Amino acid sequence: SNTPQECGKELTQMYESNVNDVLISCGGGELMCEILPYVDFDRIKAAKPKWYLGYSDNTNFTFLQNTIADTASVYGTCAGAFAMKDWHQALVDTFDVLRGKGCKNNNGVVEKQVHGSDTWERESLKNEENPAPQYNLTEKKILRKYVGGDECDTEIAFEGRLVGGCMDCLVNLTGTSFDKVKEFNERYADDGIIWFLESCDLNVFAIRRAMWQMDNAG
């Protein structure tokens, strides 16, 4: 809730600060892209790496933290959810990752096993009287696996660098001066890239257009 210039300056300063180990966004939102010209990514890249946690519009930083600063980020729940009385396992896993709890060093690669969930929330129970409710897990998770264009029912295993975020933000970044995806892909071609994508406001056809645009932009 400040000017883009001040927000970009504050984010850079807080990332460089020695008085915190992690930055957790208070929530998603709109127009975080406007602060990017005022974030000093050279200073971000030179700073001691730290976790940045957030989702949705926070893609504007979590994704660029990966592709520009070569630093891992956490695409996940924002600060408000941690006020939940009884934490869902997803919150426990997230907090453990931030603290390094349960992590193992496997030949220089830090590993942490996290849990999936069989259900998901369609409608939140959040309101003014209850700003941090339990997740309203009413919907069953359905996973469908494809190899190329063909659906399959066999086990699939793959590995690589996991990058992505909110497609609304990613397609907005495509082709801008902040788009360093080609360089990132080339740098880590031997590792392989695993994309995770979610959509906020895009309808089915907008999603297809976004996928087409990102694919043809490299």
Segments the model singles out, each with a brief description of its role:
Residues 72-168:
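Conserved anion/nucleotide-ligand pocket segment
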Residues 162-209:
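Oxyanion-binding "anion nests"
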Residues 1-19:
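ATP/NTP phosphate-donor binding region
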Residues 33, 41, 213-218:
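Feature captures the catalytic cores and cofactor-binding loops of soluble hydro-lyases/lyases
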Residues 22-24, 53, 194-196:
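Structural motif
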Residues 24-33, 38, 55:
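N-terminal glycine-rich "phosphate-gripper" loop used for MgATP/nucleotide binding
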Residues 39-64, 72-80:
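Short, acidic/small-residue loops that bind anionic groups at enzyme active sites
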